[in-house]
Amino acid sequence: MSPKTETKASVGFKAGVKDYRLTYYTPEYQTKDTDILAAFRVTPQPGVPPEEAGAAVAAESSTGTWTTVWTDGLTSLDRYKGRCYDIEPVPGEENQFIAYVAYPLDLFEEGSVTNMFTSIVGNVFGFKALRALRLEDLRVPPAYSKTFQGPPHGIQVERDKLNKYGRPLLGCTIKPKLGLSAKNYGRAVYECLRGGLDFTKDDENVNSQPFMRWRDRFCFCAEAIYKAQAETGEIKGHYLNATAGTCEEMIKRAVFARELGVPIVMHDYLTGGFTANTSLAHYCRDNGLLLHIHRAMHAVIDRQRNHGMHFRVLAKALRMSGGDHIHAGTVVGKLEGERDVTLGFVDLLRDDFIERDRSRGIYFTQDWVSMPGVLPVASGGIHVWHMPALTEIFGDDSVLQFGGGTLGHPWGNAPGAVANRVALEACVQARNEGRDLAREGNEVIREASKWSPELAAACEVWKEIKFEFEAMDVL
């Protein structure tokens, strides 16, 4: 080729590598109401300036790549690129920053949590220029959230279906989590529901194993539900875990649950995946089933303070993908959950409009418009002595779930359920009378145990049980 010959590459295109901040760090940018906003905790490698690190996150999670490419000229990068528009240091940390990134809405497929996460928490988390990266929060604009169905039914519809108002709902995970036959499993379900619980639950590990195939479990649990309903006059439910190896099998199990006439099914939304979860949520709305969500695997993603994704983001994603309940920690039990942080994402699950509040870890104001809310489920290492704190912390719109705290009662499953129901009713009554559960909770339980031998026995068994470990994820 003659030296004088001009090519496309030599006109308006300069090959090579340039700093991300030249294109993707735009502190002058005014965010739009339609932008998806993200707050990342960024720990750069030594020698990488904060602006370059923040810009790299914006680039690698949107339109950028490691080198300049001539096909940039075939589109409008200004329209589609992510922008790092602000950076602030993390107090008390030497080389850590919060980078705020704005993404134009056109980058994301409507109604797809899967596509949204593929971009925002995709390959950028393995980027070598960063020692660690954590997505702390996400602002989902109404223009995007309205493309999602959200929860199949929501809090008010669930209460109307169950005809239960003015108190938290009570549940129990059947134990041992693995190894029971379907008939013995159904027996435990019946005893707990007859004793006063609203729900019992499949453990997240229970799918369709050799010792208990899913169809047998579904049938025996349905029998237990109907028998308990007939004896108590209350509507009962059992979270039948429909999680399976394929979406087709999952839907088949949900169809069978609907044919049995039970009110609720369950899904492990992180191990099952967002695409499967959204499909199941759509089926549940169309067919009148409530959907309980377990968060198995969440701690792999959210427990480390410097890397991964905070659970408040996973909670928002679940509200969009669809679920009527989700496990949300207990604050007082055996599982991770600091109070202010937990209440922050509990509000993000339940409320329509949540103001920015950094004291609770909420980086952005979130407007869900008319999307139904999700009931937070407190579960894991809780018992009757925790009831006042749980009632005070979570309020009425919650599910309090006692597995070992029901089935571990010295007199059996039904007395364990009675003890929990009595404790809950006593706490709700005391609260409604104006008593301070935070200060008087133990006294409320002691008073109730004087006329409930089941509660008295439970109080004696668990009087010394505490889980006093420092939370890993704090503000």
UniProtKB/Swiss-Prot annotation:
It catalyses: 2 (2R)-3-phosphoglycerate + 2 H(+) = D-ribulose 1,5-bisphosphate + CO2 + H2O; D-ribulose 1,5-bisphosphate + O2 = 2-phosphoglycolate + (2R)-3-phosphoglycerate + 2 H(+). The modification N6-carboxylysine is found at residue 201. Binds 1 Mg(2+) ion per subunit. Mg(2+) binds at residues 201, 203-204. One of its GO terms (biological process) is reductive pentose-phosphate cycle. Residues 1-2 form a propeptide. Keywords: Acetylation, Calvin cycle, Carbon dioxide fixation, Chloroplast, Disulfide bond, Lyase, Magnesium, Metal-binding, Methylation, Monooxygenase, Oxidoreductase, Photorespiration, Photosynthesis, Plastid. Its EC number is 4.1.1.39. SUPFAM superfamilies: RuBisCo, C-terminal domain (SSF51649), RuBisCO, large subunit, small (N-terminal) domain (SSF54966). It is found in: Plastid, Chloroplast. Its cofactor is Mg(2+). The disulfide bond which can form in the large chain dimeric partners within the hexadecamer appears to be associated with oxidative stress and protein turnover. GO terms for molecular function: magnesium ion binding; monooxygenase activity; ribulose-bisphosphate carboxylase activity. Signal peptide: none annotated. Its main location: plastid. The record marks 334 as: Transition state stabilizer. It is an enzyme of class 4 (lyase). HAMAP family: RuBisCO_L_type1. PANTHER family: RIBULOSE BISPHOSPHATE CARBOXYLASE (PTHR42704), RIBULOSE BISPHOSPHATE CARBOXYLASE LARGE CHAIN (PTHR42704:SF19). The basic functional RuBisCO is composed of a large chain homodimer in a 'head-to-tail' conformation. In form I RuBisCO this homodimer is arranged in a barrel-like tetramer with the small subunits forming a tetrameric 'cap' on each end of the 'barrel'. Belongs to the RuBisCO large chain family. Type I subfamily. RuBisCO catalyzes two reactions: the carboxylation of D-ribulose 1,5-bisphosphate, the primary event in carbon dioxide fixation, as well as the oxidative fragmentation of the pentose substrate in the photorespiration process. Both reactions occur simultaneously and in competition at the same active site. Heterohexadecamer of 8 large chains and 8 small chains; disulfide-linked. The disulfide link is formed within the large subunit homodimers. This is Ribulose bisphosphate carboxylase large chain. The lineage of its organism: Eukaryota, Viridiplantae, Streptophyta, Embryophyta, Tracheophyta.
